[in-house]
Amino acid sequence: MELKELTAVELGEKIATKEVKVREALDSVFAEIDARESEIHSYITLDRERAYERADRLQQLIDSGECKSPLAGVPVAIKDNMCTKGLLTSCASKILGNFVPTYTATAVKKLEAAGAVIIGKTNMDEFAMGSTTETSYYGVTRNPRDTTRVPGGSSGGSAAAVAANECFYALGSDTGGSIRQPAGYCGVVGIKPTYGTVSRYGLIAYGSSLDQIGPLAKDVRDAAAVLEAISAYDEKDSTSLDRKDTSFTAALREDVKGLRIGIPADYFGEGLDPEVASAVKAAAKVLQDAGAVVEEFPLAHVKYAIPAYYTIADAEASSNLERFDGIKYGYRTEDYTDLHDMYKKTRSEGFGTEVKRRIMLGSFVLSSGYYDAYYLKALKVKALIRKAFDEAFAKYDLIIGPVAPTTAPKLGESLSDPMKMYLGDIYTISANLAGIPGLSIPCGKDENGLPIGMQIFGDCFKEDLIFRAAYTYEKIRGKF
């Protein structure tokens, strides 16, 4: 097996036993980047020189026995909406095209403490607003499985980099499916943990009540190991949870015997590609044959998830993005007459079309006369969806469904039809509204050879059950 085909944990084991040097791991990754990046465009920024400097320092620590993390020396890519000290963090936007943070996001710091080697910042939809990684100011990312198609979004660069062996794992963020949907399109594993499990400090906010950081990885074991490394209480994040149950790799030792798994009939209705439906139901049958109890059930209110999500997320975005005005940092227009004109032109020139669309929508639903009609109503729907999941998890340990209605669309299709882009997250959004964890795992391919993703939901703090089911499935069916 070539070095590039190893998983992150497998590579970490070989580095720990001195079979592979950290520099060799970097050589493997950068060879793939040099060969494929011009076509795929997974990255906005590469940090090659500093990566090799860190590799040399880590090698000394590993050789001396001072660094024993399972991820020590393993190259990682970071989505470009997480602050990295001394390294451009653009959020794929013109308005942050020259922003170099003076501090590092907590989740990234946790990886650094575990001995990770950061190789660069991945492309994404601008300010994480999109489902295709086509709204980036720095150009589109292509799906490594078929370069005529999108990788999904908004963490499309991270998913594509993992799928193309341009890194061994990556971090992404998930506001409405932005880890799970690109993982499904690119045929990798991605998990959004329970809200508050991973610190959001240093993550450039889109929808603060929905955003969560998580890993994209080659397999389930890698995803569990990375999530374990980045999960911790952080006093710098007011929504951070002090959990004592984040030994996710330990869950991989258990199977699914006796687990109750529900399949929402509402997720298998009109608009779902028959090939996707068939693959997901076949995957559920694999778990049933492995000892789980599987049955269909109705999941109330999920049909209202999309309008509720876009109302809440865009309202929060319109507030969060007010800080980008060209005064202290970022892009500033050169041609202006007064302060008001400078604000107007800076934001008009600095933000892309999709971001401006969502800012306007968010401002509208928060405006006087419409707050109760839209925003308050959306919050009530969010509460109803959370209640529906509470009722479901009183009966089932896990819920299984598709990640997306179809496999990866062609490039350009969603840009010409924004509703198609929004509907691409129809099955993932509910987890963010409810705050529950969800994982995407490959479960087959369509007639064109494109990956199909299965999504596994658990109740809050039940990532261990999700990993048990995902790992059991992966061991039985293998990797697609």
Task: List the predicted regions and their residue ranges.
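An N-terminal boundary/leader segment
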Residues: 1-52, 289-291, 479
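Short, conserved phosphate/pyrophosphate- and ester-handling motifs at nucleotide-, phospho-/glycolipid
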Residues: 18, 79, 219
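Short alpha-helical scaffolding segments that buttress acidic/His motifs in well-ordered protein cores
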Residues: 25-29, 308-309, 355-363
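Residue-level signal for inorganic ion chemistry
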Residues: 29, 51, 104, 223, ...
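Structural helix-boundary/capping segments
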Residues: 35, 164-169, 173-271, 277, ...
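Short helix-loop capping/hinge segments that flank enzyme active sites or metal/cofactor-binding pockets
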Residues: 71-91, 250-262, 315-386, 437-453
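Short glycine/serine-rich loop/turn segments
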Residues: 72-213, 264-266, 315, 401-419
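Short, surface-exposed loop/helix-turn segments at secondary-structure junctions
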Residues: 94, 98, 239-244, 334-341, ...
